């Protein structure tokens, strides 16, 4: 999860030993370990082996770069360094703010200078530092405090930072709501009002694909302020982050459809970004003897310590998209009799809500004409609720399908502009008529888009801007591309389907 744990103390104060004893070495970036990557131990002027600091100008930027890559995935991370000066922690604060991290400092500064010197001499020779270094750092401690916004704990208080399940037994029901994807009508049909006696958990993916993104977000902005509501972060919420920051990384679908809806509804970028900042990475709770893990993507087992699980795995789930069923089976295999999992995000096989006796899948493809899935837990146990999608939305999606592959090309002038000068398109002129075909580079590099797929036996009269002949768009094997995977085909194909065999 998004937790950064900084060690703070002079050499010999016990930082590295603490990390080892707590089993945190796999999660640690160590300044000395990185120094040893740049240079092996060297002899000092007294003939003793030591860790060289000659490459610190390269090492520190590398450590921060590595830390940022881990933060992008939401990895729990420990930084093993002295962190004596307040300014040493400024860069960490900046990254933590950008990636929604909480920072803790484990404080080893109360050890006496005599004890630190004694412990220093007990370390392996190459790990020892001169006594004057320890003395200098002790002198710096008096003038340097931990910056605001960073929580300081003692080594014996490490358990305070770990994620702990919340007891929801006082509520009448715990209600879980699956992927919404901009489908407001089925959400509102199910969620007529918020009952203060119930607790509500939304599993993420609130936007995109549907046609009512603004209405969904406006409702969730109101619910986010309630004490009995938790909103999880799904993978599509990264688009809200990018939108709020005016970043161009948002998906094309978001930029072309969702963003205009939000702007037209008067939802400011600041409000959208603040909403994203409030989203939770997961939610684990107990309810009258049951322990339930709720995440967007689903995990392969109930972790002993949720804080050590990367946020990316909580959002996208264990494994890849197609592994959802295997992951749920694994969870059930490892689960105690009272442990359960609820997730959304992926449903490659189209399984029902109750996958097995321990796992529930709330991805119902509501935006594809499926159902909004909900799961209610009360003293009577789990109960499944589904709400179908609106007919007008299905009509909208059908129209979108009809406009895709092999549809009539309406704007030939625009198509010619897209073909012209495209390095992946080969044009051959026959007077006023030109043929357009994708190049070998496009084929071997799999550089397929709307233009290269159409450039297949395509003949256009450039004077009249009319198509005189064309082949089918480039087609692909089953599972060759995301849109030809079985899970996608069940949404994209128009039935009845005619199957043909190509005889070579």
Which residues fall in each region the model found?
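Conserved GTP-binding G-domain of TRAFAC-class P-loop NTPases and closely related GTPase folds
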Residues: 2-8, 13, 21, 27, ...
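Conserved substrate/cofactor phosphate-moiety recognition/catalytic segment
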Residues: 13-75, 114-118
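ATP-dependent NMP and nucleoside kinases share a basic, alpha-helical "lid"
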Residues: 37, 41-45, 83-125
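Glycine-rich phosphate-binding loop used to anchor ATP phosphates in small-molecule kinases
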Residues: 54-106
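Active-site neighborhood of divalent metal-dependent phosphoester bond hydrolases
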Residues: 125, 132, 209-285, 289-292, ...
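N-terminal active-site segment of His-dependent metallophosphoesterases
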Residues: 155-219
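Acidic, His/Gly-rich catalytic cores of divalent-metal-dependent hydrolytic chemistry
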Residues: 322, 327-401
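Active-site-proximal "nucleotidyltransferase
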Residues: 398-503
């Amino acid at each position: 999860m998004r937790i950064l744990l900084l060690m703070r103390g002079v050499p010999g104060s016990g930082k590295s030993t603490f990390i080892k004893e707590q089993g945190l070495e796999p999660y640690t970036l160590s300044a000395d370990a990185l120094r040893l990557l740049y240079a092996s131990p060297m002899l000092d002027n007294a003939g003793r082996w030591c860790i060289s600091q000659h490459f610190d100008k390269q090492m520190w930027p590398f450590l921060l770069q590595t830390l940022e890559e881990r933060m992008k995935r939401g990895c729990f991370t420990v930084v093993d360094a002295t962190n004596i000066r307040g300014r040493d922690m400024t860069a960490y604060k900046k990254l933590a703010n950008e990636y929604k991290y909480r920072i803790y400092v484990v404080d080893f500064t109360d050890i006496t200078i005599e004890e630190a010197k004694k412990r220093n001499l007990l370390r392996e020779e190459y790990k020892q530092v001169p006594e004057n270094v320890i003395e200098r750092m002790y002198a710096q401690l008096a003038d340097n405090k931990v910056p605001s916004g960073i929580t300081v704990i003692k080594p014996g208080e490490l358990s305070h930072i770990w994620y702990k399940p919340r007891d929801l037994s006082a509520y009448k029901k715990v209600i879980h709501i699956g992927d919404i994807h901009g489908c407001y009508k089925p959400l509102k049909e199910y969620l007529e009002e918020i009952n203060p006696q119930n607790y509500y958990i939304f599993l993420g993916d609130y936007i995109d694909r549907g046609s009512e993104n603004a209405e969904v977000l406006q409702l969730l902005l109101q619910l986010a302020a309630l004490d009995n509501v938790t909103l999880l972060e799904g993978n599509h919420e990264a688009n809200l982050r990018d939108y709020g920051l005016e970043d161009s990384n948002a998906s094309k679908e978001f930029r072309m459809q969702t963003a205009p809806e939000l702007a037209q509804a008067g939802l400011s970028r600041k409000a959208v970004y603040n909403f994203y900042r409030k989203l939770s990475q997961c939610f684990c709770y107990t309810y009258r003897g049951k322990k339930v893990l709720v995440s967007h993507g689903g995990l392969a087992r109930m972790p002993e310590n949720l804080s050590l699980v990367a946020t990316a795995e909580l959002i996208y789930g264990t494994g890849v998209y197609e592994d959802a069923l295997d992951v749920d089976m694994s969870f059930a295999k490892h689960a105690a009799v009272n442990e359960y999992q609820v997730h959304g995000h992926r449903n490659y096989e189209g399984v029902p809500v109750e996958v097995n006796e321990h796992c529930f899948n709330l991805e119902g493809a509501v935006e594809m004409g499926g159902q909004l899935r909900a799961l209610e837990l009360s003293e009577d146990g789990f109960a499944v609720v589904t709400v179908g999608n609106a007919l007008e939305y299905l009509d909208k999606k059908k129209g979108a399908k009809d406009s895709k592959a092999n549809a009539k090309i309406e704007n030939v002038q625009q198509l010619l502009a897209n073909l012209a000068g495209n390095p992946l398109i080969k044009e051959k002129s026959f007077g006023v008529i030109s043929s357009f075909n994708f190049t070998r580079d496009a084929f071997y590099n799999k550089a397929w888009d709307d233009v290269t797929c159409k450039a297949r036996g395509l003949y256009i009269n450039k004077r009249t801007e009319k198509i005189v002949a064309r082949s089918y768009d480039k087609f692909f094997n089953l599972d060759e591309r995301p849109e030809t995977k079985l899970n996608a085909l069940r949404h994209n194909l128009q039935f009845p389907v005619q199957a043909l065999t190509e005889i070579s």
